[in-house]
Amino acid sequence: TIIIPRHVHRVKDIILEIESLNLKTACHSKKPKNLTNIDIYIVDTFGETNKFHKIGSSVFLGGSIIKRGGQNPLEAARYGARILHGPNTDNFKDIYKLLKSFKISKKINTPKELASLISFKKNKNTGVKIKKIGKIILKKTIKEIDNLINNEVKKT
């Protein structure tokens, strides 16, 4: 399991929490050579999220747990990851609705449900399908933003 904390300054607290569960951690910044006995790999560096979205079969967007509007799922969907999220997706309602209609995203209600869903094996065909749909959704979103900007420019 890979964890990419939104706030890198919290890494020490996250490590303490994980290790209190008798799980072994490794931090990306330390460039560990052997990951054989590692339970949780923590990406504690900036600018590398895309690299990990490319290799992950599913992504849990933790920003959707708290009541702040959620987290943008397009980046992960673009790379073919299945999107798992909490109940708070208000800032991205239309995107999540579309992802759900293609069975790419799933709302998680309990920690136990999350644990059961992230343990499935990666299915190459599913990943390719999700990647294609994610790219289509991203292109559509970019087109809508371009249209919005062009309409605003015409008004001035």
PLM feature spans:
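Nucleotide-activated sugar donor-binding and catalytic core shared by glycosyltransferases
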Residues: 1-156
